[in-house]
Amino acid sequence: DNVLAYDKDEYCGFIFTTNGFLNLFRLMKSVYQKRNYIVHNKDLPIYFIAGENDPVIINKKAWLKSQEFLKSCGYQNITSTLYSHMKHEILNETDKEKVYQDILNFCK
């Protein structure tokens, strides 16, 4: 059902432009530079969630490195959940209720 809805959505499935890639690469470069961070609330709750089979996180080591980067910037209240047997769209996976419950618990 999700795939069908995606295929029918006029805003999905478009061809990413050269400018789109350029801006994405600029964003990725700047997001991992400490000088771009000003921590106003070191206790801000940050919740990292991902599926263990998500190619975007590369691997668990790289995923943990992202969290360590934010800690090195000064954030101290970082928690995370890596969902086994899930891919990129964890909110559309078979066990999505677990993910939603974890997000709800984090927000309480």
What do these predicted ranges mean?
Residues 10, 50-52, 84-87:
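Short, histidine-centered active-site or binding-site loop motifs used for metal coordination
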Residues 1-38, 42-49:
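Alpha/beta-hydrolase
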Residues 46-47, 52-79:
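Conserved loop-alpha-helix segment in the C-terminal half of the alpha/beta-hydrolase fold
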Residues 73-108:
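Catalytic active-site module of serine/aspartate enzymes centered on a nucleophile-bearing elbow/loop
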Residues 20, 59-63, 95-99:
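Residues at alpha-helix caps and immediate loop-helix transition turns in enzyme cores, especially N-
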Residues 21-22, 30-31, 40, 71-75, ...:
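Glycine-rich loops and low-complexity Gly/Arg-rich segments
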Residues 13, 55-56, 89-90:
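Short strand->helix junction
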